[in-house]
């Protein structure tokens, strides 16, 4: 249990550094691009899976 607390503390510190450091805007743009990219890949694989059945 203590191990998970330490892990979550480290994740929170890293998130705070990104959030308050100004890196968040760049990371958000990259996340948006990746989201749409993976959404397209998911839809293509879904359609191809339905066609092959």
Curated annotation (Swiss-Prot):
Q: What is the lineage of its organism?
A: Bacteria, Pseudomonadati, Pseudomonadota, Betaproteobacteria, Rhodocyclales
Pfam families per record? DUF1328
Name by which UniProt lists this protein: UPF0391 membrane protein azo1750
- What is its subcellular localisation? Cell membrane
Asked if the keyword Cell membrane belongs to this entry, the reply reads yes
The UniProt entry lists membrane topology as: Multi-pass membrane protein
Q: Which residues form a coiled coil?
A: none
UniProt-listed InterPro entries? DUF1328
| Keywords tagged on the record | Cell membrane, Membrane, Transmembrane, Transmembrane helix
Q: Which family does it belong to?
A: Belongs to the UPF0391 family.
TM ranges are 6-26, 30-50
A GO term from the CC aspect: plasma membrane
